[in-house]
């Protein structure tokens, strides 16, 4: 009997089972203990393979692939701390709903807690963060193949959103030629190998029912809050709100076109808040809201009903309003709850939104971080997509720009960390093969610098704008102690990114005005390659501009 051969047959059943649930992308890190899984994935023609030497980046690459493909993505890593490096991406997926299947190779039980090399307690190590956890036994022919495949099918059928962690122990030897060991065991699955359906098919319905009193509520004064959603959903939500005559407060990730732009500015005006107090119902579609003023208003508003509609299960309202939590796909929910044509009831808010927009436009000629955020819609590639980093950059775009309705926008706004942003953007590009504009801050770029290796080979133009404000300038917006701010919060690194781009053989530009930036972008969109554009700006100008605009708009 060959242990290595049966390990591979066991792994082949696991990987083949994944194909029956829509898995097409498999992300693989190097490792020895994961050899059975890696070879099974490599030999399965149904998969598109992605490799990366850094497991933390690999997890975020998978996250980006899942965001765009809307299908589960598998990740294969070896045992030990390699597994722990998947934690940040797993946490993000749990909060934003992307389906990740983490196949973590492990030592067999007799090598755990006895001083064996690269052996840690992996079973259950991610605590409550995975949506599903499956700890498989050591491969053995005493367990029928139908148990293995039905166990995988059951776990995937139960995976509504988030990550599935499958821990896979393998005993040595891990290498060797294939022979007939386990062939009969494998063949007992019969024509399943030629089929395309799961061995065990389970139906699970999570969709919310139609709200029978919707005909009553749609005649009331309402407000629509749009959070993270798809491009198609964003267009439908915008039309739905317009028909109802309800003001739409659109997040940067809503893709609604933000018909009332600069919401994070005008929500700081007391007149706007007073008018919103007249709302009898607030309908929030999508989660992960960005704007500080929006979150402050959400925390204090008291409509008769507050509804939250999102495909993700669980509570998504940090203000704990009285109302309804409806689990449904946004497009399906809109179809069940059609709008009734009514005149807009808000008068002051459209006026304030227009005045706020004019104040922002008046400053667009200055070369700076806030102005880039406002101008970003002018730099979007045609029929492309935008990836937005975290910290200050996403807040500036949310507050100062107006992105086109239905234009794909992606970000990691679940846990909102700055780790893995470049890797996630790489996954977004690979899944769509569209021209991609990504914009991050300098610390975010440094945090995931080795992800530039993932951007060496791209299928469409990829532009990475690094806004270098020399540190974490978002802390300039917070009441951090002035004497401690630079050393303990901002942490300026005084670096530039030309050498990093050169190390990975990427194009690089450092424009000093808008004309040079536009020239660099024009050239970048003509070639299927990655271009790094470093925008060096004055340290605190972006934060100060936002604060000045907030003060101006609050007094309109």
Swiss-Prot record:
InterPro entries according to UniProt: MenaQ_synth_MenD, MenD_middle, THDP-binding, Thiamin_PyroP_enz_TPP-bd_dom, TPP_enzyme_TPP-bd
SUPFAM superfamilies noted in UniProt: Thiamin diphosphate-binding fold (THDP-binding)
Gene3D superfamilies: 3.40.50.970, TPP-binding domain
Record field: catalytic activity: isochorismate + 2-oxoglutarate + H(+) = 5-enolpyruvoyl-6-hydroxy-2-succinyl-cyclohex-3-ene-1-carboxylate + CO2
Cofactor(s) essential for the protein: Mg(2+); Mn(2+); thiamine diphosphate
Functional note: Catalyzes the thiamine diphosphate-dependent decarboxylation of 2-oxoglutarate and the subsequent addition of the resulting succinic semialdehyde-thiamine pyrophosphate anion to isochorismate to yield 2-succinyl-5-enolpyruvyl-6-hydroxy-3-cyclohexene-1-carboxylate (SEPHCHC).
Protein name per Swiss-Prot or TrEMBL: 2-succinyl-5-enolpyruvyl-6-hydroxy-3-cyclohexene-1-carboxylate synthase
Similarity comment text for this entry: Belongs to the TPP enzyme family. MenD subfamily.
One record GO biological process: menaquinone biosynthetic process
EC number: 2.2.1.9
Cofactor: binding details: Binds 1 thiamine pyrophosphate per subunit.
Metabolic or biological pathway, per its Swiss-Prot or TrEMBL entry: Quinol/quinone metabolism; 1,4-dihydroxy-2-naphthoate biosynthesis; 1,4-dihydroxy-2-naphthoate from chorismate: step 2/7; Quinol/quinone metabolism; menaquinone biosynthesis
Organism: Salmonella typhimurium (strain LT2 / SGSC1412 / ATCC 700720)
Description of how the protein assembles with itself and partners: Homodimer.
Keywords: Magnesium, Manganese, Menaquinone biosynthesis, Metal-binding, Thiamine pyrophosphate, Transferase
GO MF annotation, one: 2-succinyl-5-enolpyruvyl-6-hydroxy-3-cyclohexene-1-carboxylic-acid synthase activity
């Amino acid at each position: 009997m060959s242990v290595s051969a049966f390990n591979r047959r066991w792994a082949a059943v696991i990987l083949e089972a994944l194909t029956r649930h829509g898995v097409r992308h498999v992300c693989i890190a190097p490792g020895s203990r994961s050899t059975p899984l890696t070879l099974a994935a490599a030999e399965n023609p149904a998969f598109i393979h992605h490799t990366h030497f850094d497991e933390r980046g690999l997890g975020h690459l998978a996250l980006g692939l899942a965001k765009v493909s809307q299908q589960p993505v598998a990740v294969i890593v070896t045992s030990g701390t390699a597994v722990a490096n998947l934690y940040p991406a797993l946490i993000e997926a749990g909060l934003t709903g992307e389906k990740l299947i983490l196949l973590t190779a492990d030592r067999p039980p007799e090598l755990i807690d006895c001083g064996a090399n690269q052996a840690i307690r992996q079973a259950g190590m991610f605590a409550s963060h995975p949506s599903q956890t499956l700890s498989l036994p050591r491969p053995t022919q005493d367990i029928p193949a139908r148990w293995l495949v039905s166990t995988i099918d059951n776990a995937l059928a139960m995976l509504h959103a988030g990550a599935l962690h499958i821990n896979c122990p393998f005993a040595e030897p891990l290498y060797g030629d294939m022979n007939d060991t386990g062939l009969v065991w494998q063949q007992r699955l019969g024509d399943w190998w030629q089929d395309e359906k799961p061995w065990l098919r389970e139906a699970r319905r999570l969709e919310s029912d139609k709200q029978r009193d919707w005909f009553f509520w749609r005649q009331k004064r309402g407000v629509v809050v749009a959070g993270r959603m798809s491009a198609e959903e964003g267009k439908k939500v915008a039309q739905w709100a317009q028909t109802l005559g309800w003001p739409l407060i659109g997040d940067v990730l809503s893709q609604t076109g933000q018909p009332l732009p600069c919401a994070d500015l005008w929500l700081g005006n007391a007149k706007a808040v007073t008018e919103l107090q007249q709302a009898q119902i607030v309908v929030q579609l999508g989660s992960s809201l960005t704007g500080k003023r929006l979150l402050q208003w959400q925390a204090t508003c008291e409509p008769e009903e507050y509804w939250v509609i999102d495909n993700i299960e669980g509570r998504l309202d940090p203000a704990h309003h009285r109302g309804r939590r409806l689990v449904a796909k946004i497009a399906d929910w809109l179809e069940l709850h059609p709008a009734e044509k009514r005149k807009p009831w808000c008068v002051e808010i459209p006026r304030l939104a227009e005045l706020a927009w004019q104040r922002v436009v008046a400053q667009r000629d200055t070369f700076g971080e806030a102005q880039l955020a406002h101008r970003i819609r002018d730099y979007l590639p045609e029929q492309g997509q935008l990836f937005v980093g975290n910290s200050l950059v996403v807040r500036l775009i949310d507050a100062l720009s107006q992105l086109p309705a239905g234009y794909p926008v992606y970000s990691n706004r679940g846990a909102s960390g700055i780790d893995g942003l470049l890797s996630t953007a790489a996954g977004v590009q690979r899944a769509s093969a569209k021209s991609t504009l990504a914009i991050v801050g300098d610390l975010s770029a440094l945090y995931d610098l080795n992800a530039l290796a993932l951007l060496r080979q791209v299928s469409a133009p990829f532009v990475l704008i690094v806004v270098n404000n020399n540190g974490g300038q978002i802390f300039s917006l917070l009441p951090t102690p002035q004497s401690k701010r630079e050393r303990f919060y901002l942490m300026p690194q005084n670096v530039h990114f030309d050498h990093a781009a050169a190390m990975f053989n990427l194009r690089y530009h450092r424009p000093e005005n808008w004309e040079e930036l536009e020239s660099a972008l024009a050239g970048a969109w003509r070639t299927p390659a990655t271009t790094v554009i470093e925008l060096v700006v004055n340290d605190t100008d972006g934060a100060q501009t936002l604060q000045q605009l907030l003060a101006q708009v609050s007094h309109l």
